């Protein structure tokens, strides 16, 4: 209901399966697709047999979230208005290159709706020119913390 009724996306498909595609493993699940305005899809698996009991707890948005661009501030404000009308928590942050509206969906997944700032392309082009060096510097600065927290073997897989 949330993706259709609140966010206005079209339910494009709901496919129920009794085995894991490409394997002989028997498992019942559903793959649900919602079509976005640009023709792309956001899709979810519904696997109640294997979902952990804390599945619906909000996830840390810094760890993982889905960002979707909207075409205008008016569209962003319309989403915010719709959310406010059903008393759904949301907040807006001006990141300078985009303005973002953040929410958690009913599954606990953080969603971000963004609208580009007028100088978005200029800001992104400037950042692109130094992006590889920024990642290198960040990796060097945080490597020991990550090794301590996750273990060197875990990081070697990334």
Annotate each language-model stretch with its function.
Residues 1-41:
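Core segments of cupin and vicinal oxygen chelate
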Residues 10-13, 74, 86:
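Ligand-binding pocket scaffold of soluble enzyme catalytic domains
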Residues 16, 47-49, 71:
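Histidine- and/or cysteine-centered catalytic micro-motif in compact active-site loops
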Residues 19, 49, 117-120:
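A short acidic/small-residue loop/turn micro-motif
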Residues 33-37, 54-158:
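Vicinal oxygen chelate
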Residues 41-44, 112-113:
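Short glycine-/small-residue motifs
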Residues 53-57, 122-125:
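A short, polar/proline- and glycine-enriched secondary-structure boundary/capping micro-motif
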